[in-house]
From Swiss-Prot:
Source domain of life: Bacteria
CDD domains tied to this protein: FBPase (cd00354)
Amino acids binding substrate: 111-114, 201
Keyword Cytoplasm: yes
Species the sequence originates in: Methylobacillus flagellatus (strain ATCC 51484 / DSM 6875 / VKM B-1610 / KT)
GO cellular component labels: cytosol
Pfam families, per database record: FBPase, FBPase_C
Protein name according to UniProt: Fructose-1,6-bisphosphatase class 1
Length: 331
């Protein structure tokens, strides 16, 4: 099996991926190993509880949220090619003074942290964007997801995996903890166009808009309903785990707009969650939409902007887009 480092050399030769991007990806991989180690020892070190404060999202921070964020930020501050970082856990972007890096790093350092003390799967999500020439500031991060140079996630589960794309397919690597190396175990991941599996938080059903109500009702009706086939529902409450299932087994993942989040545009963060995952899903042959437009075409208005998310099997996402075409996108 190929080591991650060997695979990245191949990418440089076959697709002319910039070597600076590849170096950054290797540093991100090492960072994810460090985060995995902190999670593994979390209970033994007393780091499974709350950090005693809220993040900019108004969510309670776990101690491991803060630790993971510090690990990512420390790596980026030393990485010569990173000019600035933005994190779901930080109110503002951090620009590294005196650095002339070509890239911006965006990350959710610990996705699904509410699951960490239950010993369920959690993850880290990252995205690499081009830095503008000249000075870098917070506005530099407000780029459409289609401009991402690379994106990926680490999944901390029964094994630690790194799944990434540099715009030439999606590939999964599994960590050998004894050697400290990621090996290519899931080359060329793809999402089947059709599926009988959906992932959504059904407890929010009464708040959904009519198109999603209709779609889920048809799925639940199964073989006796208009779809003529039975569906299974899944829900982990960790986006990394949900998207990983899409890439490995297929399906569709929904975190739609609901009546409580209309003013915010949705629940999931565009820069830290929706964009990197949308790039992965599209590179695997799936689709990703807000219901009204392609997620990767959304122009961010702020670092912590939120959007509705529906992604996965092409036929299902197209159906959801069709159902949304009869509704007002501003409602």
């Amino acid at each position: 099996m190929l080591k991650l480092s060997e695979f990245l050399v191949q990418q440089e030769r076959q697709h002319a991926v910039a070597d600076n991007v590849l170096t950054l990806i290797q540093d991100i991989a090492a960072t994810c190993q460090a985060v995995a180690r902190e999670i593994r020892y979390g209970a033994l070190r007393g780091n499974m509880g709350s950090a005693g404060r809220e993040n900019v999202q108004g969510e309670e921070q776990k101690a491991l949220d803060v630790i993971s964020n510090d690990i990512f930020t420390a790596m980026a501050s030393k990485q010569p090619h990173v000019a600035a970082v933005a994190s779901e856990e930080m109110a503002q972007a951090q620009v590294f003074a005196g650095k002339q890096g070509k890239y911006l790093l965006v990350f959710d350092p610990l996705d699904g942290s509410s699951n960490v003390n239950l010993n369920l799967s959690v993850g880290s999500i990252f995205s690499i964007l081009p830095a503008p020439e000249g000075s870098v500031d917070e506005a530099s991060f407000l780029q459409a997801g289609s401009r991402q140079l690379a994106a990926g996630y680490a999944l901390y589960g029964t094994s630690t995996m790194l799944v990434l794309t540099m715009g030439h397919g999606v590939h999964g690597f599994t960590l050998d903890p004894d050697q400290g190396e990621f090996y290519l175990t899931h080359p060329g991941l793809t999402i089947a166009a059709s599926t009988e599996e959906f992932a959504i938080n059904m407890s929010n059903q009464r708040f959904w808009q009519p198109p999603v109500q209709r779609y889920i009702a048809e799925c639940i009706a199964g073989s006796s309903g208009p779809r003529g086939k039975d569906f299974n529902m899944r829900w982990v409450a960790t986006m990394v785990a949900e998207v990983h299932r899409l890439l490995v087994r297929g399906g569709v993942f929904l975190y739609p707009l609901d009546s409580r989040a209309v003013g915010r545009g949705g629940r999931l963060r565009l820069l830290y969650e929706a964009n990197p995952m949308s790039l992965l899903v599209e590179q695997a042959g799936g689709l990703a939409t807000t219901g009204h437009r392609r997620i990767l075409d959304v122009e961010p208005a702020g670092l912590h902007q939120r959007v509705a998310v529906m992604m996965g099997a092409r036929e299902e996402v197209e159906r959801l887009q069709d159902y949304h075409s009869f509704t007002d996108p501003t409602a």
